[in-house]
Amino acid sequence: MTQYIKKINLKALIFSFILITGFLLLSSQATEAKPKKTPKRIKVIMIGDRLVDIAFNLGVLPEAMSVRCSMWPMCEKLLSATQIMGCPKCIVDRIPNIVPDTAKKRGIKRIIIEKHPNFCFYKPKVKPANIVPLLEGKGMTIEYVDFANGLESAIRQTAELLGRKSKADALINRYNKAMAKAKDALPKEKLGKKVVIINGTYQRATGKTFLRIEMPGGYSDHFMLKPLGCKNIGDALKSKNKKVNKGHFPIRKLSVLSKVNPDIIIMTGNIFAVQKALAIEMKKNPALADLPAIKALAIYGLPFYGDSSVMEYPSILRQWTDALSN
């Protein structure tokens, strides 16, 4: 009887942990995201999220921009500060007139474009420079920031184009110090843990949640799990009829987690959506409490890194390191 009560109490503790952790993570992330100073808005259009991320950290925002909002968390916070025209694919394929029309309407003559050898893992053919043929004969000055020689070079190029050369060294030094600390914090040996990454979306109007599992080989594997020596086992949860879109596939029931026994469960996107789904599933299926990740309370809400928030990479890597090394 005593053992039964202990088991019930453990499940109640886990259930409470899942609920409380999500709320704490959401509030802390919202606090950390606040910029220190309001950036100066200049009369230019920028295309490429890495470019805009650097510009923002140099204290500058374009009057209009094309970025991957689903990949760059800062995008949502800048909706009222600048015009977001759509992603680099949309402005070419779906709304090809938006850049020249926006430039004409706002009196903008200058376009700065990001050049990157691997702009998007999910859409290899998408390049910010694909917009250039649509701007020919429009009287635009087109300039580029080339990331081929690394981030430091890209920072210096951006700073020069924006008249912020004096701020380049400080930003580079800040990044290098943060990166050195992040690397020092990495485990000396591979952790060898099995990880499932669940991305959540919460529909406020209806209260519905939508979940996706991140497939191996994507951004989290390359930038987070590989340095930590962990394995993404999300593909083992994919049924034959599920289609992969942007490195993820949809999932409805988290009871399938029992098939793979993850050591760690990572929640990205809207953490509450994942947290809510886990709590509901545990009520239906109390046996989930015996999964290694849940039993050890190794359930972490972490920011997704899609190689857009380039200046924030060290701090995001450090968060993943702290969580997975625990």
What are these regions (language model features)?
Residues M1-I8:
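N-terminal secretory signal peptides that target proteins for export/translocation
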Residues I14-L25:
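Bacterial N-terminal signal peptides
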Residues S28-A33:
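Boundary at the C-terminal end of the N-terminal hydrophobic targeting segment
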Residues P39-K43, F147, E160, S258-V260, ...:
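Structured C-terminal subdomain patch of bacterial secreted/periplasmic proteins
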Residues I42-L58, D169-G229:
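Basic- and aromatic-lined ligand-binding clefts that recognize polyanionic substrates
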Residues D49-P124:
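A short, structured surface patch at a secondary-structure boundary
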Residues R68-K77, T209-G247:
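Alpha-helical, coiled-coil/dimerization segments enriched in small aliphatic residues
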Residues N118, Y122-K127, I131-L134, M267-M282:
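A ligand-binding cleft/hinge motif common to bilobed small-molecule-binding domains
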